[in-house]
A protein has these predicted regions:
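Glycine/Thr-rich phosphate-binding loops of Rossmann-like dinucleotide-binding domains
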Residues: 30-32
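Glycine-rich tight-turn/loop motif centered on a GG-T
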Residues: 1-5, 34-45, 114-119
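Conserved C-terminal portion of the radical SAM core fold
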Residues: 10-27, 46-113, 122-152, 156-159
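Glycine-rich phosphate-binding active-site loops on the catalytic face of alpha/beta enzymes
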Residues: 164-167
Length: 167
């Protein structure tokens, strides 16, 4: 398939130039309703997984993200994590690399096209991080992104399943 060949070619060139891993942004929520409502201009689930599957096949580790607290429902967050878990299982079984880290990202409504959204609460942040650790036990690291959650909440998140902080 031409698109897959171009993707493989591009990732191999980037790796040869020194790129060691991919950050994993752009996943948003793996749900057609959410994608159509809020992220029509983004790559979408199939494209996102194509990039990561190809990277894993050539030995490049990646991270995975989930942007939550906007228009998605709790069950759509769970489905997102289940899809990541299934992909990670496949990567661990048959590829040279896999996801190294999962980073749940709190949606910040201010200044966005979804500014009417309430955004996540601190409790939602902690629940999401804890559920992530339980559901994604096949991904080595769960990261609290303190820029979006505050430094104090990220510190608490270290007791809710996170083993890393960034920001």
């Amino acid at each position: 398939e031409p698109t897959q060949s171009l993707l493989l070619f591009g990732l191999e060139r980037l790796r040869e130039a020194g790129l060691g891993s991919l950050p994993g942004g752009g996943a948003e929520i793996f749900d057609d309703r959410v994608h159509d409502e809020a992220y029509q201009n983004n790559v979408g689930e199939a494209g996102w997984f194509d990039v990561h599957r190809t990277a894993h096949e050539i030995g490049m580790f990646t991270n995975a993200t989930m942007l939550y607290g906007h228009v998605e429902r709790p069950e759509e967050r769970i489905t997102h994590m289940l899809k990541l878990r299934a992909h990670q299982d496949a990567s661990l079984a048959s590829r040279k690399a896999s996801f190294n880290c999962f980073i749940p990202l709190s949606f910040i409504p201010e200044g966005s096209e979804l500014s009417q959204a309430a955004g996540p609460t601190g409790l939602m942040d902690l629940k999401t991080l804890a559920i992530s650790r339980l559901m994604l036990d096949n991904i080595p690291h769960i990261k609290a992104f303190w820029i979006m959650q505050s430094a104090k909440l990220a510190q608490v998140a270290l007791n809710f399943g996170c083993d890393d902080m960034d920001g």
